Amino acid sequence: MKIKIICFGKLDKKFYIDAFNDYFKRLEKYADIEIIELKEEINGELNKIKELNSD
């Protein structure tokens, strides 16, 4: 199974970073995970999202 996680912006609070890392460690045992981080500018990245969804 392949999972793509598309994120807008970055996590800024330590609690969220720790929670994400823990969850990621659990998931990567069962699936191939790709994390794509985009800028917070939604309009500027819309074409990139469409391109990623076409895969």
From Swiss-Prot:
Give the domain of life: Bacteria
A single MF term (Gene Ontology): methyltransferase activity
Q: Which Gene3D superfamilies match?
A: 3.40.1280.10
Gene Ontology biological process terms, A to Z? rRNA processing
Q: What is this protein called?
A: Uncharacterized protein in ffh 3'region
